[in-house]
Amino acid sequence: MAAARLLPVPAGPQPLSFQAKLTFEDVAVLLSQDEWDRLCPAQRGLYRNVMMETYGNVVSLGLPGSKPDIISQLERGEDPWVLDRKGAKKSQGLWSDYSDNLKYDHTTACTQQDSLSCPWECETKGESQNTDLSPKPLISEQTVILGKTPLGRIDQENNETKQSFCLSPNSVDHREVQVLSQSMPLTPHQAVPSGERPYMCVECGKCFGRSSHLLQHQRIHTGEKPYVCSVCGKAFSQSSVLSKHRRIHTGEKPYECNECGKAFRVSSDLAQHHKIHTGEKPHECLECRKAFTQLSHLIQHQRIHTGERPYVCPLCGKAFNHSTVLRSHQRVHTGEKPHRCNECGKTFSVKRTLLQHQRIHTGEKPYTCSECGKAFSDRSVLIQHHNVHTGEKPYECSECGKTFSHRSTLMNHERIHTEEKPYACYECGKAFVQHSHLIQHQRVHTGEKPYVCGECGHAFSARRSLIQHERIHTGEKPFQCTECGKAFSLKATLIVHLRTHTGEKPYECNSCGKAFSQYSVLIQHQRIHTGEKPYECGECGRAFNQHGHLIQHQKVHRKL
């Protein structure tokens, strides 16, 4: 587009300075509705920026006058075109109101200018003709500067100009008003003085050093998103954000790490990634001294100490300490599972869960414990594992005082006191304290066994069962009794064994008062009172109250 046309600056041999007489109307660039309709969204955005910048600069000179209607329209987010006037006063679009009464001798104007060609590429119509002031394309991406020009004269009685001038960058006095477009960088003498923020948002009172920054900010309040992606239709409030978004479609990743070669779409992501190599963690929690690579991670962490949960689900009222967790939660209500595994077709509501799941297929365990060398497929599991070495249990139950190494474990424990079971099975109605227990239970109905032993091919519905099974092959017995030194492959088995030394029998029968050291033994015992025999022989139909008794009975049929 050609450069934006601004009114020539009227000045004469008056004793008052030009600045004292300059008003916003003298330099405003007004549009008719037809001209406004012809602009694309990007041009409209640039027009808004230039007009607001112009007004801000005029105001900064301390000149009197009320706020023009067009500025009020822009602040309200309305279309800033002016109504066409009737007859000879019909708007010329790009010119302010008083310009309709002026006639410009373009030949004189251009010959007075330092032998430079007119920046608007007007054509000479002859010495006796007035210049054709028909609108040219409105705004360019180059800098537009309004400053002092050679003195012109206006005959106020006849409303005829004796001279007129095209504005030239060479004639600028830098003490005058300067209007700059968004796309050009400010030179030091053009920038707003350091620390000064003259542009204030009328909605929230926030101040900015440039009007273009104010305009971008105001789109938060108006919801305006003029920059639209031509591929997917997604809209953005800033052109720079659209440029970054386009890289999703093009696959462009121009920012490459010098250490490992990993590439990123956005420079800020590369800067954060560099901290992995340098080990830099500049953001430290004042409560517990834990440090983070990103400020956002610190802010999220601090909510553990404050208990703040600012993100509330509008459907169920549940609150979260991070916006991404809220978005993931909302998919519980919508049933949306946008992340699909290419190997088995299983879908997930959270991308992180998909990545964890894919490691089942690849066997990848990228998170290694620095203490014992044990590797894990999930970082959160490694963090929990670290507490085995440190013994740290920072989360305490307010009911019973029991402490836990992880906050989620505390939350699950608290449901023992409240008896809350928020996760119900749609098939049978059985409810569970933990969501993971529901998922595992649902495999009873589906028959799914996604966890397969690499040694013998045996499959399991729960990952924990696979881990326990693998110890049969490895012979690992990580749980040792401190009393007698006996080792066990399962922690639960160690707990039961310890009761041999303590004599503890916490499970008591309500019918006869007999106590047991194991919950499973209590369940078997209670069948004596109820007469329940859930284990039935497929050969003869005989039923038993214990699974072990059924196994023994079936050997009778095999001998026959």
From Swiss-Prot:
Keyword Ribonucleoprotein: no
UniProt keywords, alphabetically: DNA-binding, Isopeptide bond, Metal-binding, Nucleus, Repeat, Transcription, Transcription regulation, Ubl conjugation, Zinc, Zinc-finger
Alphabetical list of SUPFAM superfamilies matching this protein: beta-beta-alpha zinc fingers, KRAB domain (Kruppel-associated box)
Zn finger intervals (C2H2-type): 199-221, 227-249, 255-277, 283-305, 311-333, 339-361, 367-389, 395-417, 423-445, 451-473, 479-501, 507-529, 535-557
Chain residue numbers at which the record places covalent cross-link Glycyl lysine isopeptide (Lys-Gly) (interchain with G-Cter in SUMO2): 125, 136, 148, 162, 225, 421
GO cellular component, one term: nucleus
GO biological process, one term: regulation of transcription by RNA polymerase II
Function: May be involved in transcriptional regulation.
Family (UniProt): Belongs to the krueppel C2H2-type zinc-finger protein family.
Name under which the protein is recorded: Zinc finger protein 250
The organism's taxonomic lineage, starting at the top: Eukaryota, Metazoa, Chordata, Craniata, Vertebrata
Gene: ZNF250
